[in-house]
Every structure is written in structure tokens, then in C-alpha cells.
């Protein structure tokens, strides 16, 4: 099963979710993309720090979401606006959800970009919780 995480720039939330998911569910394929990503950019310094501190899977360089990405089995966005943009550009999709929506929770993963280390830690903790719930659903 291929699961794609999507955020805005593919430098904070979605690559962090990808790294966490790869550690938690090594038998599934995970990738990440950004709606407005500039290709081949590294993740933010705080994301790098968190990946190293928690011994997570190495992050990949940023990639912009394209029509080819619709081939993923499940596409999980960090916010409603990401989901809406995918549907506006590519039509209504029955396999695109917000991460919160997929695990039956309300809310969105707030973008820590430009914020403090504490904001990134909060995002990391939220993603761990959501991805553990995702594991319960798909495994």
C-alpha cells in the first residue's frame, strides 16, 4: 500500500509524517509532497533535528504534488485547504482525506514553518499520535 502525505512546501509537516510512518509501519510505502513545493529543497532545520533526535527514517528532498501522485492508494493532507486544492486541480477524489479526517478526528496539523522549536515539537507529537491511530486502521 502506498500512502502519500501532503502539506504546503514539503519541508515540515509532510516529510516529518513520512519519516514517522516509515518507522512505525515499515511494511508500507510512504512518500510526501507539497502543494506549492519547490523541488529538491531540504527539510527545515528543526525537522532535521527531530528526525535525528528520534532516530527516524531519513527525510527526502521536497517534491511538488503532481497528477502522477494521484496513483497513491491513500493521500493524506495536513489541512482541509490542501485537500480542497487537490480536488480543485484534479477533480473530486475518493482517496484524498485530511490526516485527522482519516483517523476520525477533527482538526488540522498546524504549520510550524518559521516557528519555534517548541512548535515543531508539538507538531511532531501530534503527528506521532495521528500516525499511531493510522497504524491501527491500516495494519
UniProtKB/Swiss-Prot annotation:
The active site is at residues 7, 13, 111. The keyword DNA repair does not apply. Signal peptide: none annotated. It comes from the Bacteria. The keyword Ion transport does not apply. CDD domains: LMWPAP (cd16344). Pfam families: LMWPc. SUPFAM superfamilies: Phosphotyrosine protein phosphatases I. SMART domains: LMWPc. Inhibited by N-ethylmaleimide and sodium orthovanadate. Keywords: Hydrolase, Protein phosphatase. It catalyses: O-phospho-L-tyrosyl-[protein] + H2O = L-tyrosyl-[protein] + phosphate. GO terms for molecular function: protein tyrosine phosphatase activity. Optimum temperature is about 40 degrees Celsius. InterPro entries: LMW_PTPase, Ptyr_pPase, Ptyr_pPase_sf, Tyr_phospatase_low_mol_wt. Optimum pH is 5.7-6.5. Its EC number is 3.1.3.48. Belongs to the low molecular weight phosphotyrosine protein phosphatase family. Dephosphorylates the phosphotyrosine-containing proteins. This is Low molecular weight protein-tyrosine-phosphatase PtpB.
Amino acid at each position: 500500500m502506498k500512502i502519500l502525505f501532503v502539506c504546503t512546501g514539503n519541508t515540515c509537516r509532510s516529510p516529518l509524517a513520512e519519516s514517522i510512518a516509515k518507522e512505525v509501519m515499515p511494511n508500507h510505502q510512504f512518500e510526501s509532497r507539497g502543494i506549492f513545493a519547490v523541488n529538491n529543497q531540504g527539510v527545515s532545520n528543526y525537522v532535521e533535528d527531530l528526525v535525528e533526535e528520534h532516530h527516524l527514517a531519513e527525510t527526502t528532498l521536497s517534491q511538488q504534488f503532481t497528477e502522477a501522485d494521484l496513483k497513491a492508494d491513500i493521500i493524506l493532507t495536513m489541512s482541509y485547504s490542501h485537500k480542497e486544492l487537490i480536488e480543485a486541480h484534479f477533480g473530486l477524489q475518493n482517496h484524498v482525506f485530511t490526516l485527522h479526517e482519516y483517523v476520525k478526528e477533527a482538526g488540522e496539523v498546524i504549520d510550524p514553518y518559521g516557528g519555534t522549536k517548541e512548535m515543531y515539537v508539538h507538531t511532531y507529537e501530534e503527528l506521532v499520535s495521528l500516525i499511531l491511530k493510522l497504524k491501527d486502521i491500516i495494519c
